[in-house]
Amino acid sequence: MSALDNRLFAKMNGIGNEIVVVDLRDQPAPVTPDDARAVAAHVPYDQLMLLQPARLPGTEAFVRIYNNDGSESGACGNGMRCVARQLFAGSDQQGLTFETRAGLLNCWRGPAEGLFTVDMGAPKFGWQDIPLAEEFRDTRGIELQIGPIDAPILHTPSVVSMGNPHAIFWVDDIHAYDLGQFGPLLENHPIFPERANITLAHIVDRQHITMRTWERGAGLTRACGSAACATAVAAARLRRTDRIVEMTLPGGKLTIEWREGDDHVLMTGGAELEFEGRFDPALFVGACDTTAA
């Protein structure tokens, strides 16, 4: 028996990032990695957002995030906007606070109808915090490359943690590289002991970046909110952009602000409800991993 048997779910997307949201606040039973994989086989998604009972005063829920391969993620900005949209519906609330593995995240209604803003917290740049397998004093560009030493195909990525590890390769054309080929190699490179999200990014001007991402545990994605945050921050660290930028991803646009003062990263974008349904218990027959979520 699974905690997801007969549970209602919402299939959503955050500018193309495929999200499934399940409210389990009334049922604190464990959900397993096998359950998460079973859901992905039935309702394809990039991230599964599980709302579990709040553990801290002042929070709406503890949000556990699964990738479609059954691994867990500490943060998913697009998913949090989808969660916020669901909970704001039919409510006059202006803001919500959630707990995740990466810490507390605040969400509020955006500047226009259908937009939502998530405070993703402050980025981390220390090699131990990302984490990396060896010491790098300057994470604005680390020694890592794909291809021949004298003619690398991709090289010298910036690395950032937004609650999960990100590597950003700066390129002139984000479509000139087979990210489906290089993505899994770089995601699983030994330098990243917890694997990494891999992004190709092109700086158009000081207020605009285009990007594509191979998402850790999910693969090629039309949008990755935490990658957009990491990329915007990395570009600003290099002094190549301002601290407020428009990010163009395959699935749409996000506005990212790396706020002065507290260094928190604010992400604003849309969230759409595609359909709602109920899980058939037959999906979880054989999902026998008993690791509690």
From Swiss-Prot:
Site feature Could be important to modulate the pK values of the two catalytic cysteine residues, where: 166, 215
Residues at the active site: 76, 224
A GO cellular component entry from the record: cytosol
Organism: Rhodopseudomonas palustris (strain HaA2)
Domain of life: Bacteria
Residues the record lists as binding substrate: 17, 47, 67, 77-78, 164, 197, 215-216, 225-226
Quaternary structure (record): Homodimer.
Keywords: Amino-acid biosynthesis, Cytoplasm, Isomerase, Lysine biosynthesis
Protein name, UniProt field: Diaminopimelate epimerase
EC code(s) of this entry: 5.1.1.7
Main location per the UniProt record: cytoplasm
Keyword Transit peptide part of the UniProt annotation: no
Coiled coil segments of this chain: none
GO BP terms: lysine biosynthetic process via diaminopimelate
Species classification: Bacteria, Pseudomonadati, Pseudomonadota, Alphaproteobacteria, Hyphomicrobiales
Catalytic activity from the UniProt record: (2S,6S)-2,6-diaminopimelate = meso-2,6-diaminopimelate
Function summary: Catalyzes the stereoinversion of LL-2,6-diaminopimelate (L,L-DAP) to meso-diaminopimelate (meso-DAP), a precursor of L-lysine and an essential component of the bacterial peptidoglycan.
The UniProt record lists the keyword Transferase: no
Pathway: Amino-acid biosynthesis; L-lysine biosynthesis via DAP pathway; DL-2,6-diaminopimelate from LL-2,6-diaminopimelate: step 1/1
GO terms of molecular function: diaminopimelate epimerase activity
Sequence similarity: Belongs to the diaminopimelate epimerase family.
Subcellular location(s) per record: Cytoplasm
